[in-house]
């Protein structure tokens, strides 16, 4: 049996006006680490909005690295993290060459591919592609396949989008890409996962999304994505 801890929206470095919330965040992350150990979790997924700003404080960055190192158990438990709409994609991927030796994989750009190979902790990155990674752990006799869908705005995908029907083109592009990856790499002989940082609704839904707080960077509109349809999630 595979045990997964899924977490997201840490917003490290968040401030409430002039007050830092780093002390609260340390307590929450300590509890997450304890749960991962108590439940003997095999895999940790961190699904975006790791930081609260594009340029996080030194204290926030230090807290992230210390927490992920604990969660990875010195490279014996994989941690896979993607960027959200609050994160800088370049900043998130910056420590990847060092972090991967501890089994920590960052992914934030659709044009990047995680390098394959066996790490010191025993984890093997057996297959990878743009938006996809397959992991093999020594204790498991089946692979773990993860479709990686970090937040992406229309600017980052502008080469694929026309001026007209931009919203429809964006949805179609992502949905087709996810399905192609699922068809190519996923089958019943492994555990197939999708990890993304988007806003999904059912097509034709008449229920408007909840209003975002003024302090939130919008995930819908203002250069961000429109909502995606649940029908665009891949079938395996």
List each language-model region with its residue ranges.
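Short secondary-structure boundary micro-motifs
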Residues: 27, 80-81, 118
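Short N-terminal secondary-structure initiator segments
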Residues: 1, 15-16, 76-103
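His/Asp/Glu-rich metal-coordinating catalytic cores
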Residues: 87-236
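Short, charged helix-to-loop "capping" segments that act as catalytic/coupling loops
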Residues: 71-78, 109, 114
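N-terminal active-site segment of His-dependent metallophosphoesterases
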Residues: 1-69, 73-76
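Active-site neighborhood of divalent metal-dependent phosphoester/pyrophosphate hydrolases
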Residues: 11, 41-59, 76-90, 200-204, ...
């Amino acid at each position: 049996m595979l045990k997964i801890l899924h977490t997201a929206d840490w917003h490290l470095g968040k401030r409430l006006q002039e007050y830092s919330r780093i002390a609260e965040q340390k307590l929450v992350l300590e509890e997450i680490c304890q749960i991962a150990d108590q439940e003997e979790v095999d895999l940790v997924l961190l699904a975006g909005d790791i930081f609260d700003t594009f340029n996080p404080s030194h204290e926030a960055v230090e807290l992230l690295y210390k927490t992920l190192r604990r969660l990875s158990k010195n490279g014996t438990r994989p941690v896979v993290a993607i960027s959200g709409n609050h994160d800088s994609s370049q900043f998130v991927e910056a420590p990847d060459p060092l972090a991967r030796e501890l089994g920590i994989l960052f992914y934030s750009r659709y044009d990047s591919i995680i390098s394959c190979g066996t790490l010191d902790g025993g984890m093997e990155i057996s297959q990878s592609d743009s938006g996809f990674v397959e992991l093999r752990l020594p204790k498991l006799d089946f692979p773990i396949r993860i479709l990686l869908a970090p937040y992406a705005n229309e600017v980052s995908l502008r080469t694929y989008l026309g001026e007209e029907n931009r919203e429809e083109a964006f949805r179609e592009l992502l949905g087709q890409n996810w399905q192609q990856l699922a068809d190519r790499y996923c089958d019943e002989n492994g555990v197939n996962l999708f990890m993304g940082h988007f806003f999904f609704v059912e097509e034709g839904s008449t229920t408007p999304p909840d209003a975002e707080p003024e302090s939130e960077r919008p995930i819908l509109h203002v250069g961000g994505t429109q909502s995606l349809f649940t029908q665009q999630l891949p079938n395996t």
